[in-house]
């Protein structure tokens, strides 16, 4: 690798790539140069090739993901396919869309130290670097925690910390805000500001755009594997709302987003919670809560990462048993088995609930007498029809999310619970999911 700073740190020269056995998700004739210290945001609809860009830079293509690659990807003037993986890992740090896939340890401190440890650093340096990382990123409260007991947002923070501890020159972030609450997104923005101030090169594949407008030097818009536009933040802000929606992109200014006026709901409650207390490993998560919900009502449950939203959702569906109080449906008590039969939950990490070998089969998996007409219509409405023969594990994160939502629409349950249903979704998919939820409620 070249000594000192290279003006062009990353280069794509006529790059095309297609995954083995897949028609979608590849790239076509990509030409792009990224300078050292630059922050570049990649945006576009789910499956447009954002994640593929990051896999080409960190060497996972072609060393892990198989397919047909044409053109050259260079880092520091060297073709990435010729650089040993251990050298790439020392220079390029990756935070994946699903942080669970990059964890190697069961506790947070060991995970943060894992990359440095593999570089055979002295033990004292490991300790100092973990402490410095926790201080810089303000995650002291996450130290010495069991990773499996963290919320999705907390896992995302540890994944970023494990990369930060290695001090790479290049950061690759794939949907880094997908599991974060508003406060944590602001913290992420400050972390990105910090590494940019340190002169790091940052590539971000993201659907949430608003928090990056002051950080990105350039914004690259991808469509069906091709670069359709490269903008400065100022140029991007001046896109009309109609242009942005046509491109399938979320808002760049949250002040422009106003929720619709809620419909009046019949006051007769169908679901009731009375004096419910939830515990996890003898620790009280939520205490003495009550809830009354009418038929057709859509209720949003909000709170910070780790506040108990997922535990509450799991309790509603009968998946969390350590609870006290009453759960009633139409005035009749429901124990956890009854709640399991009446409800369906789309989890925050949908990889836990995709079992079939095709999208089409997933839509009838475990469902008695599935309505095939409804299944086909739902796949069409969520833009999944072209992928009906694809294995769910070959889809992008946003596409997997839509598959899980599609199953919830088809299963015929009375109570649907969605845990972060819009994480990883582009604008089109987000509005489609919102429309389906509203239609089901009606």
Where are these regions (language model features)?
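Conserved ABC ATPase "signature" region
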Residues: 124-142, 372-387
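Catalytic Walker B motif of ABC-type/P-loop ATPase nucleotide-binding domains
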Residues: 171-174, 416-419
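Conserved ABC transporter NBD signature motif
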Residues: 66-78, 325-339
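Conserved ABC ATPase signature
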Residues: 146-150, 154, 391-395, 399
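Helix-to-loop junction immediately C-terminal to a conserved catalytic motif
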Residues: 58, 317
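H-loop/switch region of ABC-family ATPase nucleotide-binding domains
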Residues: 206-207
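The feature captures the beta-strand-to-loop junction immediately N-terminal to the Walker
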Residues: 43-45, 302-304
């Amino acid at each position: 690798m070249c000594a000192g700073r290279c003006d062009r740190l990353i280069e794509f020269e006529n790059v095309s790539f297609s995954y083995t056995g897949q028609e979608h998700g590849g790239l076509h004739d990509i030409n792009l140069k990224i300078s050292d210290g630059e922050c570049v945001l990649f945006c576009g609809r789910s499956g447009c090739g954002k994640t593929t860009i990051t896999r080409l830079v960190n060497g996972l293509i072609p060393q892990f993901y198989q397919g047909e690659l044409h053109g050259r990807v260079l880092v520091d003037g060297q073709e990435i396919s010729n650089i040993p993986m251990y050298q790439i890992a020392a220079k390029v740090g990756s935070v994946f869309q699903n942080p669970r896939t990059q964890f190697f340890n069961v506790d947070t401190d060991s995970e943060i130290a894992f990359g440095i440890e593999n570089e055979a650093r002295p033990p004292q340096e490991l300790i100092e670097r973990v402490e410095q990382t926790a201080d810089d990123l303000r995650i002291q409260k996450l130290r010495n925690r069991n990773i499996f007991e963290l919320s999705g947002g907390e896992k995302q923070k540890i994944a970023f910390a494990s990369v930060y501890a290695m001090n790479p020159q290049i950061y690759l972030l794939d949907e880094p805000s997908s599991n974060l609450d508003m406060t944590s997104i602001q913290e992420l923005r400050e972390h990105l500001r910090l590494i940019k101030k340190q002169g790091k090169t940052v590539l971000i594949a993201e659907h949430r755009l608003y928090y990056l407008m002051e950080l990105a030097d350039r914004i690259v818009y991808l469509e069906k594997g091709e670069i359709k536009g490269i903008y400065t933040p100022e140029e991007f802000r001046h896109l009309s709302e109609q242009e942005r929606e046509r491109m399938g992109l979320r808002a760049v200014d949250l002040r422009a987003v106003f929720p619709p006026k809620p419909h009046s709901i019949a006051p007769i409650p169908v679901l009731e919670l009375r004096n419910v207390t939830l515990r996890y490993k003898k620790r009280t998560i939520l205490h003495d809560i009550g809830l009354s919900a009418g038929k057709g009502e859509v209720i949003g449950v909000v709170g910070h990462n780790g506040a108990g939203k997922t535990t509450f959702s799991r309790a509603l569906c009968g998946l969390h048993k350590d609870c006290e109080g009453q759960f009633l449906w139409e005035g009749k008590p429901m124990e956890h088995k009854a709640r399991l039969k009446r409800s369906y939950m789309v989890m925050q990490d949908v990889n836990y609930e995709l079992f079939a070998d095709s999208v089409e089969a997933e839509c009838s998996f475990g469902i008695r007498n599935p309505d095939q007409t409804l299944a086909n219509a739902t796949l069409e409405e969520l833009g999944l029809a072209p992928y009906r023969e694809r294995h769910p594990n070959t889809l992008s994160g946003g596409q997997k999310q839509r598959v899980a939502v599609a199953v919830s629409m088809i299963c015929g349950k009375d109570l649907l619970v969605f845990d972060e249903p819009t994480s990883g979704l582009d604008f089109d998919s987000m509005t489609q999911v919102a429309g389906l939820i509203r239609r089901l409620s009606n």
